[in-house]
């Protein structure tokens, strides 16, 4: 059976996975060491962002352990379910990290009363908030606009619409006809109240399925399922970069204020 990822891609992911924990610890230390002026900003940084990034790192490690990227056999339902739980939590906390960083800035800069709650955020349409950031950070945030779009879509689907799940497997084009024939025969066996024949046909049909480590929510609402291992890594690295840039922004604002 063929693995979904090639060897080079697998090696790259394993390598990056090794740095998730040290990068998390480094970011935590930096945020804990930062001298916050506002107590709410400090709470959002220490108990919001810092806690979420730790959860995100753990979720990624769990998802990679439960369903490794090199998996070729369809994992058990329990394993798929456990991986889904971790991916759902990862998406929710990635979204939460971004939101927490926006609130850290708003409180630390004393903007909570002048910016409406609906305008607190880092996307292009959060105009009032974006105006308070440096041109350099605004430019960087512009490059993340499509990533923000994906994140909001997946988080909203998880929170309000169809939860994220890992399809148990797909059938290769050459096996489509055979799989459909077995599906029809399974239905006939059920109608004939013949559970043993149904189980036999189901086992036969499952042999045609190939595992693909993809995640999706609604087939009607999204263009195509997405490979979750590289996406989890990319999300983590984006949150880390954003966290470091926001820390730089806070430090620059504090320095300018003290002069």
Positions of predicted regions on the chain:
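Acidic, Ser/Thr/Gly/Pro-rich intrinsically disordered interaction regions
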Residues: 1-88, 92, 100-259
């Amino acid at each position: 059976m063929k693995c979904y990822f090639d060897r080079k891609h697998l090696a790259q992911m394993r390598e990056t996975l090794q740095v998730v924990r040290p990068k998390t610890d480094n970011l935590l230390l930096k945020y804990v060491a930062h001298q916050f002026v506002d107590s709410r900003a400090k709470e959002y940084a220490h108990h919001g962002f810092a806690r979420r990034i730790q959860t995100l790192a753990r979720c990624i490690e769990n998802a990679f352990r439960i369903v490794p990227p090199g998996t070729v056999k369809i994992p058990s339902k329990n394993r798929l379910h456990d991986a889904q739980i971790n991916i759902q939590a990862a998406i929710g906390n990635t979204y939460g990290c971004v939101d927490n960083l926006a609130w850290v800035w708003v409180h630390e800069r004393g903007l909570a009363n002048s910016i409406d709650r609906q305008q607190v955020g880092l996307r292009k349409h959060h105009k009032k908030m974006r105006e308070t950031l440096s041109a350099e950070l605004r430019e960087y945030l512009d490059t993340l606009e499509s990533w923000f779009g994906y994140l909001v879509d997946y988080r909203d689907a998880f929170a309000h619409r169809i939860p994220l799940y890992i399809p148990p497997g797909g059938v290769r084009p050459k096996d489509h006809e055979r799989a459909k024939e077995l599906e029809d025969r399974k239905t006939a066996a059920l109608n004939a109240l013949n559970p043993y024949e149904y189980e036999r046909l189901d086992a036969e049909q499952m042999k045609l399925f190939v595992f693909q480590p993809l995640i999706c929510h609604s087939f009607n609402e999204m263009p195509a399922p997405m490979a979750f291992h590289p996406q989890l890594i990319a999300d983590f690295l984006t949150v880390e970069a954003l966290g470091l840039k926001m820390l730089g922004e806070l430090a620059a604002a504090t320095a300018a204020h003290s002069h």
